[in-house]
A protein has these predicted regions:
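Alpha-helical interface subdomain recognition
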Residues: 1-112
Length: 112
């Protein structure tokens, strides 16, 4: 048999997931740096991060569940718990709409 990771569609999904994970990590570090060094755009960095990371983490977890098939939806699968946590964070950390409400004026001000 062939490993599931050797199918082209799964390879693409895994690659996209890794790109997303690295992008999320970079945004987190950039926002932390902006706060730590009291950058003028720290509010924007945090708002963008809080909008992007929960949404993207949920998408990555959904892809992992899709790769695992039915096993990914069982309560015993760790990815199912991760997906639930990610989805909960989308709500708990402030909805996407609130992050847009915070971000948009700051972005417009930056490019005036």
């Amino acid at each position: 048999g062939v490993s599931i990771g050797q199918f082209q569609q799964v390879e693409q999904m895994l690659t996209d997931m890794e790109v997303s994970l690295r992008t999320m990590r970079s945004m987190l570090y950039q926002a932390a740096w902006a706060i730590e060094t009291d950058q003028p755009d720290k509010r924007l960095a945090v708002a963008l991060m809080k909008r992007y990371i929960p949404k993207t983490a949920t998408e990555v977890a959904s892809s992992a569940m899709q790769i695992l098939g039915g096993l990914g939806y069982t309560e015993s699968a760790r990815v199912s718990t991760i997906w639930q946590d990610c989805r909960g964070n989308q709500i708990a950390e402030g909805t996407d709409q609130i992050m847009v409400y915070i971000s948009a004026p700051l972005i417009m001000k930056e490019y005036e």
